[in-house]
Structure formats: structure tokens, C-alpha cells
């Protein structure tokens, strides 16, 4: 009997077009709203804005982005345990649409307080919607490919990534133009319409999708109640902090201490209760790293991994070792995201103090329909996705191929840190000129955008590659969730720094100042040095059997 030959199916799954179309429209809606958000919060009341200070607007903006990258944990749980990926994407998208709708209602009110309340409700719904579907969409696309179509996945994800930048590029061009012509109501409303279209496109393909059923969770109600309790507790703490004379410093410190204590108790209880020598590998595998750290405190001697090896299987120990090393690298990444996401906040606020680039002659004929008579700070944000679409193939197919094995993932990421830091040196120099009273063109911002975007490609794209190749097979989804948390942590860092170094405090400049930009540049350079030192000691994961790894 002849052995059947392995065949390849070169036909794309027909449902992929619905997923890619959904992603392009969703990204247009998200970045279109995000691109005008800083200007809306700081804009004059007569022009429909909220007239906030730069510091307050920066804090709110980055808390919103933080929520966008923290809520994927909720979306992943809903997807894996209750609704499945299709159900989660569809139903959570409705909250997303509602958030845009709430923001679009701002023109119906004249009271600044009413508009601010709408802003809070709208951003909360959008954060839950955008974050909730984030871990589901790309994984759902992977579910559509059969084993004989695996060779098509790289091209499909390339189209997926291109759709993200395609949607964001045009949103930074079109939405500011709508804002100038029709006000913030339509500028927030059109992204909502695009999100509704994205949801409809996704729903239309429902009969073609391959769906992975959720595993279920018998304790889901307890977990939901616990989460609701946390939210209500947070609201209560916020009320106490704002309505009483309790020092915010001591309140935050006490809450932080209680959080650390709760985490320590949870870790001790977990590693006493779980024994992976008797149980199948589950989510307890990645806490082996914590176990190795806490065992010496509890009186055990020997190396950290010797202590862990007394309780965990070689396979679990291997997962703990690889996860611990990856998390050590990830711990330094948030500072980059603190820089990168300010391109939509403080950079826009800086650009609003610069002179718009007037379009004349050929340039007006070619680009006047997109930009109008001039390119402003909000339009300049389109520089980033445009550069990404150029730099990714240039670096991947050119630079990386040329230097070969010398361009390791960690070397790329370390280089990206210093390049991103240098972009803020340029931004600080531009801000010094503005503070000196010079009238400079917003076109100057293209220069730091080149360096910041290069840093993004070197760190973001490479970081995903590094995490995927270095994580144990069963831990890849967990590691990807930690990667998203680095973005959340970076934006939380900006909010904290802006609050602590508020311009209202004596001796501190505002969020948009040369001193603040240099602070971020110096901080990133220092972290870059630490990153290089740690990367030099990093041992890349090899293919040694788990039994050999356990003997280390």
C-alpha cells in the first residue's frame, strides 16, 4: 500500500477577508478617536473642547491606554471560559460601538461637566471593547486555517498587520479634517460608524467561521463577583481619596503594601497546594518562578531552582525557568511604551504650539483633499503607520538579512531603546525652541517620528518574535498576555510621573516641557544600559530535553 503524499491547500479560507476587513475598520475607529482625544481635552471651550491643563489631559489619556491593555485579561478569560472567541468579539464589539456613540453626543451638551462625564463613560466603554477583543481577533484568524493551509498563515498575518497600519494611517488624516469642518461630534461619530461597520463585517462571515468552543469554568460566577467587588472597592477608595483629607501618598502606599501582602499570601498558598508531579500541567506552571523565589524565605537551602525542582516536574520547571527569564526582559520594556504612546498625547500637544505646514502648488493639488490647506499636529500622527509600512520590510528583508546571526532579537531590542531615547532628545530640543519663543513648523516633528518608529519596529515586532520563540509551547498565550501588560505598565508610568511632577507643584514643569522630555530620554537611556547588561547574560532557550534542564 502506498503512503499518501502530504498535500498543500493553496486556497485561502474565504472567511479571512471578513476578519481582515473588520480589523482595518476597527483600527480606523480606535486611532481616529485616539488621534483627536488630547486636542479635545485641552481645546478651548468655545471650540468644543474641555479646556483641561496639559498635565490633566496627559494623565487621563494614558490611564485610558493603560485600561486598553489591561482589559485583554478579561477578554481572554471571557473567550476561553464562557463565550468563545467569536462570541466575545461580537458581543464586546457592541460595547465598543456604544462607547463611540457616547463620545459623539458631546455636541448635545454645553456644560463642561456634562461633557466630561460623557468622556469618562465613553472611554470606559471603548477601553473595555478595544481591550476585550484584542487577544481574540488574531487568535480567531489562526483558528480558520486547516493543517494543510498552515503555510498561508504568515501571509495572512502580514495582511492582518498591514490592515492595522492602513486603517490607522488614514484615520490620522481623515478624522482631524472632519473635526475642523464639522466639530467634535462628527469627529467622534464617524469612528463609531466605522466600528459599527467592522462589527457588521465580522457578523456577515458567521456561517463560514471555524469556532473553537470555550472550555467552561464552574467558578465563573465567583470570579465575576470578585471582579465586581474589586471595581466597587476601587470606586470607594477613589471617593475617600477625593472627599476626605487623607493623604494621597499614604493611601497609595497603604494600598500598595496590602496588594504586595495579598500577592505574597496567594503565592505561598498556591505553591503549597499545587503539586504538578501528580497533576497535569495547568496555569500553575508559570508560578514556579515565584516558588523558586519564596522557597528560600521559608527555610529551604540550595539554589532557587533546586528548591523548585523538589516539587515540580522537569517539564514544569523548564516552563518556569523560561518564563522567569522572559519576564526579566519584559520588566524593562514598559519604559519604551511610556515614550511611544506619548506620540498621541504630549507630542500632539507640542505640535499644537507649532506652525502648521502650509500646502501650496503641487503639494496642495496632490494632498489637499486629505489635509486641506495645511498639515497640523493631529495629521502628523500618520507619519508613524506610514513609516512602519516602510521600515518593516526594509529591516526584515534588508538589514536583518545582511547582518545575519549578529542581529539577535535582544540586540535589536537594546538598540531600539537607545534610538527611542534619542527621539526624545530631539523632541526636547524642539520644545526648547518653542519655549524660547521661536515659531517653528510642525514638519520638524517628522524627524523624531523617524527615530521613534524605528525603535518601535526594533522593540515591538522583535519582542513578539522573542517571546514566541523563547516561551514553552504551553506558555505562549500566557507570555503574550504579559507582553500586553508591558504596554499597560508603560502608560501607567506616564500617568504616575505626570501626577507626581504636576506643574501645579512648586519647581516642576508641565507634561509638555523640554525638561520633562529630557527626563524620559535619560530614563530610557539608563534602562537601555540595564537591558544590554541583562541581555548579555541571557541564555537563549535550546532544545535540550526537559530532564536535562531539570538538572541545571
Where are these regions (language model features)?
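Loop-to-transmembrane helix entry
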Residues: 47-66, 152-158, 247-254, 323, ...
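Hydrophobic core of transmembrane alpha-helices in multi-pass small-molecule transporters
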Residues: 24, 98-99, 112-133, 430, ...
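Intracellular loop-helix junctions on the cytosolic face of multi-pass helical membrane proteins
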Residues: 1-18, 147-148, 154, 176-373, ...
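Central cavity-lining transmembrane alpha-helices of secondary-active solute carriers
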Residues: 59-80, 169, 382-395, 489
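A gly/Pro-rich, aromatic-decorated transmembrane alpha-helix motif that marks the paired
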Residues: 34-35, 70-77, 105, 165-181, ...
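C-terminal ends and interior cores of transmembrane alpha-helices
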Residues: 92-114, 418-437
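Conserved MFS/SLC helix-loop-helix module at the cytosolic interface between two early adjacent transmembrane helices
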Residues: 72-95, 101
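Intracellular juxtamembrane helix-capping segments at the cytosolic ends
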Residues: 132-148, 457-471
